[in-house]
Amino acid sequence: MEVSPEQHRWVTHHTVGQHPETHHPGLGHSYMDPSQYQLAEDVDVLFNIDGQSNHPYYGNPVRAVQRYPPPPHSSQMCRPSLLHGSLPWLDGGKSIGPHHSTSPWNLGPFPKTSLHHSSPGPLSVYPPASSSSLSAGHSSPHLFTFPPTPPKDVSPDPAISTSGSGSSVRQEDKECIKYQVSLAESMKLDSAHSRSMASIGAGASSAHHPIATYPSYVPDYGPGLFPPSSLIGGSSSSYGSKTRPKTRSSSEGRECVNCGATSTPLWRRDGTGHYLCNACGLYHKMNGQNRPLIKPKRRLSAARRAGTSCANCQTTTTTLWRRNANGDPVCNACGLYYKLHNINRPLTMKKEGIQTRNRKMSSKSKKSKKSHDSMEDFSKSLMEKNSSFSPAALSRHMTSFPPFSHSGHMLTTPTPMHPSSSLPFASHHPSSMVTAMG
């Protein structure tokens, strides 16, 4: 079997060149001593599935050398320690076929199959829904950027499945990028954000996690999460302002049959069904009779009672009449003095005029007045700024702020609960939903 230039370039690595004594004298440059292979740990990790039942068999030493992975310094190296042979979604009926191209990536470390080129019916770890994504993820340098749940309407492309040419690899990369961008657009993400997240996730997944843990089965958030602007105040038909009832009802020409009032906060009825104003109706309800229309005459004030004089100082004018212990009427000054000192007020303290003083406003009344003034000022300020507090303005302000995602960055749309396959997650994102949900 002839060895292509790519095989020769891959096999003659610097490790072989540094140790010329390992070259076999009879097999040329394409043979390397088996003692130089990393068989202790790396091969056990990469071929842990093959070690269970099927053992590799190589037809010639060139193909045996080709089956081993590149040195550990390669940036595309990935060791899948998460996969096991008991995965429930392995499909034995589908086969990826014997891809024996000259690329070092032609053999994935996952399939549980014999490594001989004529081995029939190998198992596949890829979902059997799409063969184009299977072949792209199998032979592309970006080995593990395939989505876990590709769409079913993707048809196999023979140009992609053919291996062994550089144009095929580039075309496969373009197809992977197109598929990732289409998934990002289906999630309604911003174009710039989707491109940055897709590039970050692709590099991170090829270095950390080969397969996304959660499939993209969670639907995107629909418009039901955020109410439309019409509900907030965009249209007057949704939240129609109810007309407040008039404070003083004067419709239909109603008139109180008792006092003749035409305006009242609340119209009532008497026993015969006639309309009464609120005052007459309450009076009739409480007393059982009609409310009197003529107010009774106020009795004379205590200061002007005829024939009344103070029993102590004989004065006839006072602001308030009091009574002493014997029941005799006394003026306000004599009554207070006796109440405080238990003796009659001396006559030397009598004055012709009534001494009055300017009463200071109590603290309670001051507080009530201040609160009333502050409420008036606040209502005036609200009336002046009424346009800024309208529902339409509030809706504009609310829609101008995008929602926050779980990572603290402002996104244009809410992020789904589980990351999609187009945005693979990595372990260097401490605020991802996967680590938060356990």
Swiss-Prot record:
Signal peptide: none
Keyword annotations: Activator, DNA-binding, Metal-binding, Nucleus, Repeat, Transcription, Transcription regulation, Zinc, Zinc-finger
GO CC list: nucleus
Stretches with biased composition (Polar residues): 160-169, 410-438
Keyword Plastid in annotation: no
Listed transmembrane segments: none
Annotated Basic residues bias: 357-370
Positions annotated as zinc finger (GATA-type): 256-280, 310-334
Gene Ontology molecular functions: DNA-binding transcription factor activity, RNA polymerase II-specific; RNA polymerase II cis-regulatory region sequence-specific DNA binding; zinc ion binding
Primary localisation category: nucleus
Stretches with biased composition (Low complexity): 122-142, 232-241
Example of a GO biological process term: negative regulation of transcription by RNA polymerase II
InterPro entries from the UniProt entry: TF_GATA-2/3, Transcription_factor_GATA, Znf_GATA, Znf_NHR/GATA
SUPFAM superfamilies linked to this entry: Glucocorticoid receptor-like (DNA-binding domain) (SSF57716)
S-S pairs: none
Protein name: Transcription factor GATA-3
Species of provenance: Danio rerio
Gene name in the database record: gata3
